[in-house]
Amino acid sequence: MIDQKQTNNLCLRWKGKQRRIGITGGIASGKTIIGDFLFQAKQWPILDADLYAHEALSAESEIVKKVWLRYGSKIIKNSSKNDQIINRKALAKIVFQNELEKKWLEGIIHPFVNKRIEEELEKSKSNSIVILIIPLLFEKNYTGLCSEICYIDCPRSMQLKRLQSRDNLSIKEANQRIDAQWANSLKKQFADHIINNSNDDETWKLQLKKLYKF
């Protein structure tokens, strides 16, 4: 359940001159594909929170050092002193099975992601329209950065199928990933547009073409 303060925050929208299209949805709902489609069609710059989270765990960052100290060799892909790389699958397995560990990791990654989004918005301020792909847009209170929010809607069965195929997860692990986010039904209430990605690609393509007039 969310309280009135959270509800008010979820209703916030960016009121500046730049049009900022927020794209969000459940895990494996098709956010990146849809963002890429808009970029190919309109050449609008894309700011991708997942990309910045990936950067946060790149070699030799301060965040990586903290992760190494906390979890040790079990999350290191290469044990060479000169080339220690985070095993993201091993790390994900830890945090999605333990809420405290998940909160700890998010607590050090999200400030970095926030900073990168701010930096990229500054670089893109001359563009009249930008796209922000943010998986945890509602959960982490990014609604005030967006002029409008497109929620990519697809059934849980499709999310599970994609997660198992894409990330080689068991059905239990795939369900854990989905359950770690807010329910789709809740997030849809606070979106401005619902993009249907439950059928073939033409369905959402037609929606976007109509919505953004191309």
Curated annotation (Swiss-Prot):
Gene3D superfamilies per the record?
P-loop containing nucleotide triphosphate hydrolases
Q: Which reaction does it catalyse?
A: 3'-dephospho-CoA + ATP = ADP + CoA + H(+)
Which EC number applies? 2.7.1.24
Q: In which pathway does it act?
A: Cofactor biosynthesis; coenzyme A biosynthesis; CoA from (R)-pantothenate: step 5/5
Positions with a binding annotation for ATP: 28-33
One BP annotation, GO: coenzyme A biosynthetic process
Q: GO molecular function of the protein, one example?
A: dephospho-CoA kinase activity
Question: Where, per UniProt, does this protein localize?
Answer: Cytoplasm
Q: Which residues form the DPCK domain?
A: 20-214
Q: Cellular component per GO?
A: cytoplasm
List, alphabetically, the Pfam families matched: CoaE
Role: Catalyzes the phosphorylation of the 3'-hydroxyl group of dephosphocoenzyme A to form coenzyme A.
* PANTHER family xref list: BIFUNCTIONAL COENZYME A SYNTHASE-RELATED, DEPHOSPHO-COA KINASE-RELATED
Q: Which family does it belong to?
A: Belongs to the CoaE family.
Per its UniProt record, what NCBIfam families does this chain match?
A: dephospho-CoA kinase
Name of the molecule in the record: Dephospho-CoA kinase
Q: Which species is listed as the source?
A: Prochlorococcus marinus (strain NATL2A)
